[in-house]
Amino acid sequence: MRLSPSFLSLALVIFVGEVVARNVVARASNPASVTGTRKVSLLKNVAGLPAVPTAQQVAVSSLNTDDIQGDILVGMHKQQQRFYFFTINDAATFKTHLAADIAPVVASVTQLSSVSTQPLVALNIAFSQTGLNALGVTDNVGDALFTAGQASNTVGNLKETTDNWVAQFKTPGIHGVILLASDDKSLIDQQEASIQSTFGAAISKVYSLDGAIRPGAEAGHEMFGFLDGIAQPAISGLGTPLPGQLVVDEGVIIVGGTNDPIARPADGWMTGGSFLAFRQLEQLVPEFNKYLLDNAPAVDGKSLQDRADLLGARMVGRWKSGAPIDLTPLADDPALGADPQRNNNFDFTHANFSITTDQTHCPFSAHIRKTRPRADLVAPANSIIRSGIPYGSEVSAAEAAANATTNERGLAFVSYQSQLNKGFQFLQNTWANNPGFIFGKNVQPGQDPIIGQNSGAIRSVVGLDPANPTGALSMGQFVVSRGGEYFFSPPISALTGKLAA
């Protein structure tokens, strides 16, 4: 357990806990928290995904997990979550409650690693640049994208306009975000009420978004239906990596960690924190499904639905089960998808096939290849830990019949990294949006067919038809950005130190 105090995001992540009936809820001695005895984990391990770090792994870790906010390293294991975006009206009062009432109940990585230490409400908090300014913290944090804010240059940085953005994300009025996570929404409601009561008029809620794990067999799958979060990197010094899992230095994710090359404030208050990129990404599921049916490749002996599923798998790079098409190109293998010892153990190379021309296994343009190119380009510095969650209702029968979205749904995307221009921003703009990436191939791959942006114009994607690997498909946008912001999730110690001073 290494790392010094500092750098926690304005994402106040509150993991609320398991169902009330399965936990004992008590009156909180701290007015900002919901307390009680937890009997089951507030997190969910899904078959096929890297597991939550165990207490044993955390105990022998070289990271200072007592000071790192839990959401940073927990990943995509939450069951219910609320993102509570706020503005600070009275900095002095806010600082008092931040240090006295919020900091003591912020959940660390250490706490979340064991049911016995998990709170009913696990609380994290993160701040935008305008939020730090409101608190009088004017240090150069070493990240120009964070300082400018996400809305400042979306056309140049992300290849999108703010036309579809939620109004609150278009202005710099969001000072921070509180994340509340649980499997019981009523506990989240209680926690939000407690926080609002504690801060009173010192803060105002600007916007909120609720997310939830999908029901039944879809648990762990995003709204298009694909198992999500398989390729999370492993942090050196924390646990044992799975076969094929990329191992990155702590400083790729944690500010001030090993091999974080950026100069930070000399007093070290940021060490142990991480930059949080939040994105509200609407997914047009009925339209996506209709596109797959309309453009299904011709494959002998397969039904239309099977061929549509094949196209979807080639766009993503995995079947819905999580099985990588690089290992099973023409048919899903659910057992492979559910096996973390096998489902990430590939690198796009195959004997007797050239990596510069072979798209029979996996297209160069596939989402998982564009965003983690493996043998195409080994780039551990361009890694993120994702900690998002689906939001919105399941597709209704009426929407499916009309092939049109009427109720918004999608992904509340969260990534953590020590540098936004090497993490989220790099993956989105330099890789996913860039039609020339992956470089050095015999064809130009086109944009990432899932998240790639093209400034609102039609996208051209190559290699999706296994029988015509140089052919292109044209497509609109199935993932529509509704906005977001960049935050800093500070170390827990900074909440009673630098940020409360």
UniProtKB/Swiss-Prot annotation:
Q: Which InterPro entries match?
A: Dimeric_a/b-barrel (IPR011008), DyP_N (IPR049509), Dyp_perox_C (IPR048328), Dyp_peroxidase (IPR006314)
Q: Where does heme bind?
A: H367
Under Enzyme Commission nomenclature, its number is: 1.11.1.19, 1.11.1.7
Which keywords does this Swiss-Prot/TrEMBL entry list? Answer: Glycoprotein, Heme, Iron, Metal-binding, Oxidoreductase, Peroxidase, Secreted, Signal
- pH dependence per the UniProt record: Optimum pH is 4.5 with 2,6-dimethoxyphenol as substrate. Retains more than 50% of its activity after 4 hours at pH 2.5.
Cofactor(s) this protein requires: heme b
SUPFAM superfamilies, A to Z: Dimeric alpha+beta barrel (SSF54909)
Q: Describe the temperature dependence.
A: Thermostable. Retains 50%-90% of its activity after heating for 2 hours at 60 degrees Celsius, while no decrease in activity is observed within the same time at 30 or 40 degrees Celsius.
Give any GO molecular function from the UniProt entry.
heme binding
Signal peptide per UniProt: 1-21
Cofactor binding notes: Binds 1 heme b (iron(II)-protoporphyrin IX) group non-covalently.
| Reactions listed under catalytic activity | Reactive Blue 5 + 2 H2O2 = 2,2'-disulfonyl azobenzene + 3-[(4-amino-6-chloro-1,3,5-triazin-2-yl)amino]benzenesulfonate + phthalate + 2 H2O + 2 H(+); 2 a phenolic donor + H2O2 = 2 a phenolic radical donor + 2 H2O
- Residues with glycosylation annotation: N352, N403
The GO cellular component terms are: cytosol; extracellular region
Propeptide residue intervals:
22-60
Entry's PANTHER family?
A: DEFERROCHELATASE (PTHR30521:SF4), DEFERROCHELATASE/PEROXIDASE (PTHR30521)
Q: What is this protein called?
A: Dye-decolorizing peroxidase
Q: Which organism is it from?
A: Exidia glandulosa
Encoding gene (name): dyp1
